[in-house]
């Protein structure tokens, strides 16, 4: 999940990627508003969903934890994972890794929202002029490009969040944790694996972020003007429900990719690593079966409430302060 990549909207000198983008009036002001509103909405929603997010990650990566001797037996489900985590580590441990997640998510989501509309202006398709499908495709492309543009610079924070969330007290080693905090994750990973350790799984993440964000933003902005008409335009629950359904669909479509990248993250610092994302995918399928690629998907559906809240909450804030009804990102 990257973010600043030389982006010039128009805060820095233009990069070639944005050279042909249509100019925008009051660009700095709109960019700042997008960044702030998207980031605040994201930070609040992720903190609220942190317990279910940690459970999702624990279930998703439990096979790597068992291999490393950091989990004695598999989780039987969401309830079992919640219960065992609270019993072994305390209630507050459900928020382990949330600080890194908020640090990562604030600029990631804020810039996703801001860049989505900027990329949409680059494609500049109009539904009435260019036709629905060209306009729809432009929305998908702008959503995917926004997500891809926010991948590189904060990827290491996502790695650190994943390692902290999956840092259950070791089943072999007197209940000791592997990491003492965010800085310790960086220190130990750099010592054992170098910079590459912080970016393990990055390539497959690029694919996943385009698939997920393309659907997440593109479908929402494309379907919202069609489905949320009349009084439904300002109905929080209608906007929330649409966002929840779209977040679930996008999440399930890209979930196997997410599993592979996180399983690769978990091998940094370990003696045995996957050779590539394809090797990881093949090994997981061969040794554990296809169902292993979807472990934690149930918790991910619950977690999607946070994603839906970001989208609908952002829209409602825009309506309240700016009288804007459409465009979950800026213009």
From Swiss-Prot:
Q: What is its main location?
A: mitochondrion
Q: What are the disulfide bonds?
A: none
Q: What is this protein called?
A: ADP,ATP carrier protein 1, mitochondrial
Q: How does it assemble?
A: Monomer.
For this chain the motif Nucleotide carrier signature motif maps to 261-266
Q: What role does this protein play?
A: ADP:ATP antiporter that mediates import of ADP into the mitochondrial matrix for ATP synthesis, and export of ATP out to fuel the cell. Cycles between the cytoplasmic-open state (c-state) and the matrix-open state (m-state): operates by the alternating access mechanism with a single substrate-binding site intermittently exposed to either the cytosolic (c-state) or matrix (m-state) side of the inner mitochondrial membrane.
Write down the chemical reaction(s) this protein catalyses.
Answer: ADP(in) + ATP(out) = ADP(out) + ATP(in)
The record's annotation in PROSITE patterns points to: SOLCAR
